[in-house]
Amino acid sequence: MFEQTFKNIDDVLWKEAGCTTELDYTEQTSWLLFLKYLDDLEGERALEAELKGESYTFIIDKAHQWSVWAAPKGQDGKLDQNHALTGDDLIDYVNRQLFPYLQGFKQRATSPDTLEYKIGEIFSEIKNRFQSGYSLRDALEYIDELRFRSQQEKHELSHLYEAKIKNMGKARRNGGEYYTPRSLIHAMIQVVKPQIGEKLC
């Protein structure tokens, strides 16, 4: 499921003038996946809190939640075409409202250890490279189909990311230096024999 979605998104990005390398593809796919994952996670946490009779405070304001700007749904559970931004409206929203809002988390966070600070740090370092709101809408719809509930789904996603980073290295592009072959990882673990509670300096 994830593999086909990644291929579909790469096809969309291939048509984008602002995306020319595997690194661009990975970066653009990453910020979209991150926001979708965060929205799903917050939805689960809110549901758990509700079941316990507790309240939950969302990290992301309602107006900037995935389910509002990226994939608003109608009563039938399908994309609400009347409320889904597209074209220039979508690009303007992402560049002028969403990214500045997310970047602002860095200043609003109480400490660097918080998720809020990390969100701000991430979005201070990247740029939306989509120039066509129609292409971005296509990518959003592909990503919205993904679910991150099971360990198997999360495991599949991690393997696909690893493959993308490996491909950047093979193509002599930036990012390949972040790929460590699994055989080397296993060898390092066998030599170091880390134990729970130990720290590496």
Residue ranges and their predicted role:
Residues M1-I196:
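Non-catalytic, mostly N-terminal accessory regions of nucleic-acid modification and defense proteins
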